[in-house]
């Protein structure tokens, strides 16, 4: 499966305002997935108000994760997911919905669960078939407060890079034994990679042995050997980079 990052503004530029712009972009990828039999997992990489303070979540101006402090932003996220799910409810190449990429804020275990429940409740009003995927707090890895499972078609996800859990015994006990076997739910690693080839191969084999699904991150990059695909920077692309950088 290919994990596809989404920005909420492509589907809902303002609160309670829906847009089809994002579907115009996604539909070409859906056609590609159908053509080559590649499942797609839709991933909310940037949520209203931002789910962490990193640049990839589009944290605005003050660098805060205001998804957790604004009920309006939480409703906005849930309504956006309902909009997306309603559009793709009958699309078989869509494997599931990754509700929130790498949430990160201290002391929000209860709030994070409430956000997920709002999103799932909204999705299930229009789509009872697709999987819903939830990530733990602290960039996907702390699932405190997210048990027991609260949907019959739920997947628990975590991310793994060098610098995280380094021994496979601890990882097995925390994820395979502590989540999948205890609660009878599937596991999926939504991100791993961008380290050495040897490390990547070894951890992939660990996932495969333990029936843990995975998706390499990221699938395509610019002039890097750590991605599955890489492309060269063209003169036109460099001009764009220079413009963004103010040169």
State each model region's role.
Residues 1-2, 12-96, 115-124:
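An active-site-proximal structural segment forming one wall of the substrate-binding cleft
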Residues 245-247:
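Intrinsic low-complexity, glycine/proline- and repeat-rich
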